Amino acid sequence: MTNIHSTAIVHPAASLGRNVVVGPYSIIGSDVSIGDYTRIGPHVVITGKTVIGCNNQILSGCILGSVPQDLRYIDSELTGLYIGNNNLIRENVTVHRASGNGVTYIGNNNLIMVNCHVAHDCQIRNNIIISNSVSLAGHVIIDSCVIIGGHAGLHQFVHVGALSMIAAMSKIEKNVLPFVVVSGMPAITRTINLVGLKRYGISKTDINYIRLMLENLKVQPLAFDTYSIFKKFKSDNLLKRNVAVQYFSDFLFNSFRARGFIPFKVPKK
């Protein structure tokens, strides 16, 4: 049975599923849809064209689906926010709807901690942990199984590869390669994310291929011909066409065409 606190304001046109809980003083707008068993804490505002799936927990003070901080945004744009299932969104998180007829997207099984900001048009996949006070600028993409440490800041249009880890207080201005650990201001790629790869059951064979690809990128990091390395990945018989290699090489190629990727630490001479 749906339970709406007497002080909450839920627009009659809003769609609430079975056993939804809406806490004290929360406000649910007219274009909002909330799936079964989702719990909304006190003092939460959900507005705009926002769709929230099932079994989510949204704690006090969150503001979801509000107008993007984009000076080009026009009120008539049909933008929205989509949040999947089984997400835990902690206190005072802000998530803005998209601009330019797009959708801000948050997938499934994510933990977004206190005071985080997810800007317009961000795409957050699945099984991601975003620690306290992380700020994602517009159009950031985070692939699945990423961990982001507290107070990190991500530049707009950055793409974070799967199974990577960003250390606390890092400044992310370029793409983060899959399967690595980055840290620093500005960030530097430090090492392979071996703990994360093992945790998600990546095979030893795939880990060895990933190590080999990363070692290739470490060679003369300030002078290598990135396109030649990409072609080597595509043609080298040693790198079999498994999922990890395909994903890494595609990510690398797209990074060359866009923002580039965070470089490796250069050893001191």
From Swiss-Prot:
EC number(s) given by UniProt: 2.3.1.129
A Pfam match: Acetyltransf_11
Primary residence: plastid
Classification via InterPro entries: Acetyltransf_C, Hexapep, Hexapep_transf_CS, Lipid_A_LpxA, Trimer_LpxA-like_sf
Pathway named in the protein's UniProt entry: Glycolipid biosynthesis; lipid IV(A) biosynthesis; lipid IV(A) from (3R)-3-hydroxytetradecanoyl-[acyl-carrier-protein] and UDP-N-acetyl-alpha-D-glucosamine: step 1/6
Gene Ontology CC, one term: chloroplast
GO terms under biological process: lipid A biosynthetic process
Protein name: Acyl-[acyl-carrier-protein]--UDP-N-acetylglucosamine O-acyltransferase
Lineage, top ranks: Eukaryota, Rhodophyta, Bangiophyceae, Cyanidiales, Cyanidiaceae
